[in-house]
């Protein structure tokens, strides 16, 4: 919204002469997104249009519920067996994808330990992003728990869609882009935590649609294990 506000101000002051399109990359829109001199609002999903029209007075002719743009590879056909073979993973094991880079170091270490203790028969893909400290600490924890053969620890990756395609569940914070990519892959979500504001709104959207569960602080690991073992529930969440 900050960039949109800046562009709106520059247009009002006749300092730029360009079309302005506001792409709302979350599943709810706050007042801060709505400013004059915007030619189009692109929404993540159609139901958001009602709020823009009724509450914020946006002209429906400039509202386009086209979705958040992502790469085509998230929706393209894939070969699970081939991906698993290339990545050294077992295609027959329940697989949990943990997007650990967005969590605090201490919390994700204890959370992974709890998962490993409760589900040693499952396999885990843990992506830390560019968090070097977290990567190093997780290496130690994985060795301590004896889960080297059942855990693939990754730093920054450019093919996250492959890991989404072969996973049964993703554990993540509900950022707009990750949510969209997971939905495109029909990947059920377990929401680790959600800050008030856009993340909380995204979480509410997913919970209302039945595409995610919200993990409880003390029993989050149990929630995940129980869900992954409930194939019927997982299939419902994919729809």
Predicted feature descriptions by range:
Residues 1-58, 62-65:
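Active-site and donor-binding regions of nucleotide-sugar-utilizing enzymes
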Residues 39-95, 99-102, 130-131:
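A nucleotide-sugar donor-handling region in carbohydrate enzymes
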Residues 80-82, 89-166:
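Donor-nucleotide binding loops and adjacent catalytic segments primarily
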Residues 161, 179-185, 204:
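Short alpha-helical segment that forms part of, or immediately flanks, the ligand-binding pocket
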Residues 165-174:
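Acidic donor-binding loop of glycosyltransferase active sites
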Residues 168, 186-188:
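A short alpha->beta transition loop at the rim of the catalytic pocket in nucleotide-sugar-dependent
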Residues 188-219:
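Nucleotide-sugar donor-binding patch of glycosyltransferase catalytic domains
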Residues 213, 218-239:
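Conserved donor-nucleotide binding/catalytic region of nucleotide-linked donor-dependent transferases
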């Amino acid at each position: 919204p900050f960039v949109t506000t800046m562009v709106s101000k520059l247009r009002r002051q006749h300092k730029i002469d360009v079309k302005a399109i506001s792409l709302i990359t979350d599943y709810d829109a706050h007042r801060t997104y709505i400013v004059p001199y915007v030619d189009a609002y692109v929404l993540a999903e159609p139901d958001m249009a009602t709020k823009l029209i009724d509450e914020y007075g946006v002209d429906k002719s400039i509202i386009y519920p086209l979705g958040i743009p992502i790469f085509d590879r998230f929706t393209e056909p894939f070969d699970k067996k081939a991906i698993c073979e290339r990545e050294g993973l077992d295609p027959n094991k329940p697989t949990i994808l943990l997007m650990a880079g967005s969590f605090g170091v201490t919390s994700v270490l204890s959370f992974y330990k709890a998962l490993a203790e409760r589900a040693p028969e499952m396999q885990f893909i843990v992506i830390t992003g560019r968090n070097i400290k977290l990567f190093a600490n997780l290496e130690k924890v994985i060795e301590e728990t004896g889960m080297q053969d059942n855990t693939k620890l990754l730093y920054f990756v450019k093919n996250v869609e492959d890991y989404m395609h072969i996973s049964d569940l993703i554990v993540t914070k509900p950022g707009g882009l990750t949510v969209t990519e997971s939905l495109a892959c029909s990947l059920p979500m377990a929401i680790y935590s959600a800050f008030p504001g856009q993340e909380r709104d995204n979480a509410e959207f997913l919970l209302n649609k039945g595409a995610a569960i919200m993990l409880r602080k003390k029993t989050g690991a149990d929630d995940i294990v129980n869900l992954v073992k409930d194939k019927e529930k997982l299939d419902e969440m994919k729809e």
